[in-house]
Amino acid sequence: MLLWFLSGSLLLFGTFDVWYFLRGLWVALRCCFQSPIRDVLAEQVVHGRVLLHDMDFMCHMNNARYLRECDFARFAHGTRIGLFMAARALKATMVVGATTIRYRRSLALGEGFELRTRIVSWDEKSFYLEQRFVSKSDGFISAVMLCRQNVIRGSPQNILEFLCKRKVDCPDISEDLQHWIRFISASSQALRAESGLDDKTK
């Protein structure tokens, strides 16, 4: 029996990213026991620490881990403000359409950090979120990420009005976010032209 259990565990851990799903389940359960956040524009903070399985060859948190941590933080953010439930009620779904991360200073093994997530703006198709890794030792912003969360079969404004039961004013789009949105649009147009999609839609 023990041999079967060990063999099954080895097969499971060898073929699936088990820790990812366990972490996701833990985040979901924790959100169930935390009080909901009514302010959809409020910044949410989750706390983390660089552990052994986060390391790269230089004993820093590896680049991929930043994106993984952002995934879980966005999930917690959307769950606690009720964004996902509102989207589901309206039969809409949300998917990540683009991310850009800028690394400013590495996070070392054992270093604690805060991951701060907030909605910075939205348009007719997408939410735009900013996520910051802030070192607990000195408050330095070690990395900052912008994320475009596309809404399918719905719109951000409709979701927010359904959630808040009132009109929610969209914050002004900052200059750096405008540049980033233009970059995404230009990249999309270039890729469509490269694949011949523009010709097919004319």
Curated annotation (Swiss-Prot):
Residues 1-24 form the signal peptide. Keywords: Secreted, Signal. The keyword Nucleotide-binding does not apply. It is found in: Secreted. One of its GO terms (cellular component) is extracellular region. It holds the Pfam family 4HBT_2. It comes from the Eukaryota. Gene3D superfamilies: Hotdog Thioesterase (3.10.129.10). InterPro entries: HotDog_dom_sf, THEM6_lcsJ_thioesterase. Belongs to the THEM6 family. PANTHER family: PROTEIN THEM6, PTHR12475. This is Protein THEM6. It comes from Danio rerio (Zebrafish). The lineage of its organism: Eukaryota, Metazoa, Chordata, Craniata, Vertebrata.
